[in-house]
Amino acid sequence: MPVSIPNREEILADWEAHPMRRPRIQKVTINIGVGESGERLTKAEIMLQRLTGQKPIRRKAKKTNRDFGIRRGEPIAVKVTLRGPKAYEMLKRLLAAVDYKLKASSFDEHGNVCFGIEEHINIPGVEYDPEIGIFGMDVCVTLERPGFRVARRKRKRARIPTRHKLTKEEGMLYMMEEFGVEIVEEEG
């Protein structure tokens, strides 16, 4: 069942009147958690590089877990961060892999959204390579308003006031308006 946003018209009017309040994509992060180092991690790295055209970085285990045979500091995942037009184009392809449907629970209180893709071959334009195999991935989309740089810059750093932060509803509305995403309730 699609989710409706109660104050939809009010938010859209605010974005129209104040362009600095309209959200934008800060970054798209694609993560493949392999759970082991070695050949499988290298294959995931190759696949992610082919998919994004960018060199992935390896993520290391934070803790030792004997049940899974993981040591602290051992590389167990690969990640790519995309920004700008590249992030926008990649997000369109990734959303097509999930049929432009996202769960309402995938959004956090700041309007950011994360979703999973079970098999990378579901992404349009990706061919199956028997040498590499099939990988799933987590996709996190971080949204922001123009002006958020003041919280990250080195000099004259300032806090973002609560009224300028994004809400969950605004994040949902942005994804619906910009990408034509359908937001569904969980069946329970």
Swiss-Prot record:
GO MF term list: rRNA binding; structural constituent of ribosome; tRNA binding
Keyword line: Ribonucleoprotein, Ribosomal protein, RNA-binding, rRNA-binding, tRNA-binding
GO cellular component, one term: ribosome
Membrane as UniProt keyword: no
Protein's name according to its UniProt entry: Large ribosomal subunit protein uL5
Function summary: This is one of the proteins that bind and probably mediate the attachment of the 5S RNA into the large ribosomal subunit, where it forms part of the central protuberance. In the 70S ribosome it contacts protein S13 of the 30S subunit (bridge B1b), connecting the 2 subunits; this bridge is implicated in subunit movement. May contact the P site tRNA; the 5S rRNA and some of its associated proteins might help stabilize positioning of ribosome-bound tRNAs.
UniProt keyword RNA-binding, yes or no: yes
Pfam families: Ribosomal_L5 (PF00281), Ribosomal_L5_C (PF00673)
Alphabetical list of HAMAP family matching this protein: Ribosomal_uL5_A (MF_01333_A)
Origin species: Pyrococcus horikoshii (strain ATCC 700860 / DSM 12428 / JCM 9974 / NBRC 100139 / OT-3)
GO biological process assignments: translation
Subunit structure: Part of the 50S ribosomal subunit; contacts the 5S rRNA and probably tRNA. Forms a bridge to the 30S subunit in the 70S ribosome.
Gene: rpl5
Family to which the UniProt record says this protein belongs: Belongs to the universal ribosomal protein uL5 family.
